Amino acid sequence: VKSWDVIVVGAGIIGLSLAIELRKRGASVLIVERGEPGHEASRAAGGMLVDSPLETPPVLQSLATASARMYPEFAHELELESEMKVDLRDQGAILFPDEKHFGHPAIHGQMKAHAISLLDIQQLEPELRKDESDRVELELARQESFPDNSVEEIEILFKSVRGRALYLKERSVDPRALTTAAWKTAKNRGVDFSSGDPVTAINISDDQVSGVTTIKTTFLAEKVVNCAGAWSSQLGPHPIPTRPVKGQMLCLAMHPRDLIKHVIRTPDVYLIPRSDGRLLVGATVEEAGFDKRTDPDTMKRFHQAAIELVPKLAEARILEDWAGLRPGTPDNLPILGSTSTPGYYVATGHFRDGILLAPITARLMAQVIHHEKPDYDLTPFSLSRFSPMSS
């Protein structure tokens, strides 16, 4: 009977990235996926690689920064092996902040960003809406460049007429292309796949993992990793407090293709341009169970918000809309590491950061599975933080 060194449950970007990393280390790997690889939260994601302290929980900052730095090599490797592009863009983001971005004590003294003026914004994105006072200011404005500033300095700048937004040096990637490239790479590397057959049980023999049972069959392995995202809580042997958090998204066709060049984030909506001319508008954060239906009123609101920001988008064709189910946890931080059952590991609960954290999660989990000291302390992400009995 065939067996594997490791079974990974879930073929989202986390499971795929981990399987590739394990194959690099010589392990035989089987991925068991309830549906189609990469077709749940990974496919529905926006793909903003946000590691700014303005928007990243402090305890997650080191992992987010490390993973963001890994992305060029990570994406390049997937592109080479899959012979397809993942649309990793270095365009940066324009953030129109609200008060909470400046009030969080964790970011003071850490944040490095460019405060940009109305004139800067006009030069970066000429199609952003301007009201009459903006036009007057633009006529009076003269070019001023701001160096990297601390949060305190940026806050002062924002109290002047010049400070309108922040420019953040960050990347974005196309999650659909990324997950397809990761799936192709995993197959090329010799990862085995079982799709369309949900896992119903993690099998334990003599207090040690022995494999998984699906609706159709049983697969054998001495190590199993739960990467099942929003469905992680449905697998034993330990209670895993994940829940689905719905995110709806609208997709428009820009004309011309580079109508918007940067990611644009406001307190209400974000716009994510793709190199092929698509523009993603999102996203909701909803507690709606496993319901993946989109809401017409929400799509209208997204469309109107996009037009408010960029009037020319009134002419943009609506291509599609969708919803995905992010894996949330009680503290909205991931669950990473081993458990008290030998051979059973968990890498789930990445909430809104699964795409960003895929490279570092794969590296750290591979280290844990091979009984090496991980590059970063995973104690804050241990399953045991929810209950002493659950680890």
Set out the residue ranges of the language-model regions:
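Active-site substrate-recognition segment that forms the wall
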Residues: I20-R25, G47-L49, P53, M84-R89, ...
